[in-house]
């Protein structure tokens, strides 16, 4: 296992001396954040922030938790102070009519209204879809955990800047039991695979723009290994492994790849290539989002 040490993150208002000001929205509830810290060393938002800091040294990051009952409600003009918003994954089911989901959907609608460019992974994509009028469902058959295989760009996605640098087909870290059923009106489907037909999309709504993916470009193989172990019972119940030992074998391979991304034997055994193993390639959608929607506006400010 690879527990990840907690890091320090910048909090606070905009200052022109920093590279960017990012707002990271945790999709987890307090209990879910505590559970992930126990197993992985960080909440989803802390992990996302660490990735963004590594990719953009000098960035300032504020984390918020819109699901929390005591969380301050951020109006669009407050969100507009940031250069970009990142919405994390979580175990939430966006189709459940709970106070936590309603609060997060209200936050996402405020993000759109703020016209601040936004990016989301997994549940982050699902929140953005439902907030703009689309639909999310429980997967009819859960068969995507660990690695999303052979993701392929649509005709619209081949020339879309979100997927610049991607091969004709690629694998990515993934773990989810829900999926987008219908995109909102006007959204652009950018990629899919045989398991989940909506793997990447662009959504424009209420003056705002969102790019998102169903997979997890922000996560390392070691973090995916932790997630597999946490959900071992569910994965066995779904028929993805015969028993917990089978889940452990797959998690151990991902741990090993985390430590040795150039190990050809591990790449062969997992059935992945360097686009999955190489950190920069794995994060390419995040880098493309920042380069295309964030950096030009920051320079013009």
Task: State the predicted function of each range.
Residues 134-227:
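Pocket-forming structural segment of enzyme catalytic cores
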Residues 23-25, 62-64, 86, 119, ...:
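Hydrophobic/aromatic beta-strand patches that form the interior of the parallel beta-sheet core
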Residues 1-100, 105, 110, 114, ...:
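N-terminal beta1-alpha1 cap of cysteine-dependent amidohydrolase-like domains
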Residues 219-253:
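A hydrophobic, small-residue-rich beta->alpha segment in the mid-to-C-terminal subdomain
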Residues 15, 77, 120, 181-182, ...:
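Structural motif
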Residues 82, 90-155:
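Cysteine-nucleophile active-site neighborhood
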Residues 37-39, 99-102, 132-136, 187-188, ...:
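Short, glycine/charged-enriched secondary-structure capping and boundary segments
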């Amino acid at each position: 296992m690879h527990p990840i040490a907690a890091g320090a993150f910048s909090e606070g208002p905009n200052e022109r001396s920093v590279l960017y000001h990012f707002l990271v929205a945790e999709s987890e509830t307090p209990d879910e954040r505590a559970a992930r810290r126990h197993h992985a060393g960080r909440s989803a938002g802390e992990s996302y922030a660490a990735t963004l800091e590594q990719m953009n040294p000098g960035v300032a990051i504020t984390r918020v938790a819109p699901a929390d009952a005591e969380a301050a409600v951020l109006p669009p003009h407050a969100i507009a102070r940031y250069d970009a918003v990142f919405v994390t994954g979580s175990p939430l089911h966006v189709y459940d009519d709970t106070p936590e989901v309603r609060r997060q959907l209200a936050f996402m609608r405020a993000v759109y209204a703020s016209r601040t460019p936004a990016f989301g992974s997994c549940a982050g994509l699902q929140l953005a879809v439902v907030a703009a009028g689309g639909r999310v469902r429980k997967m009819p058959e859960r068969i995507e955990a660990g690695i999303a295989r052979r993701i392929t760009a649509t005709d619209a996605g081949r020339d879309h800047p979100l997927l610049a640098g991607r091969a004709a087909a690629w694998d990515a870290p993934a773990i989810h039991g829900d999926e987008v059923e219908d995109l909102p009106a006007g959204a652009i489907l950018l990629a899919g695979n045989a398991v989940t037909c909506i793997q990447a999309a662009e959504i424009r709504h209420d003056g705002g723009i969102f790019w998102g993916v169903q997979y997890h470009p922000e996560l390392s193989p070691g973090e995916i290994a932790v997630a597999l172990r946490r959900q071992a019972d569910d994965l066995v119940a779904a028929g993805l492994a015969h028993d917990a030992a089978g889940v452990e074998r797959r998690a151990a391979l991902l741990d090993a790849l985390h430590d040795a991304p150039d190990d050809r034997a591990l790449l062969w055994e997992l059935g992945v290539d360097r686009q999955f193993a190489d950190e920069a390639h794995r994060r390419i959608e995040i880098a493309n989002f920042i380069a295309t929607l964030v950096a030009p506006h920051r320079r013009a400010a």
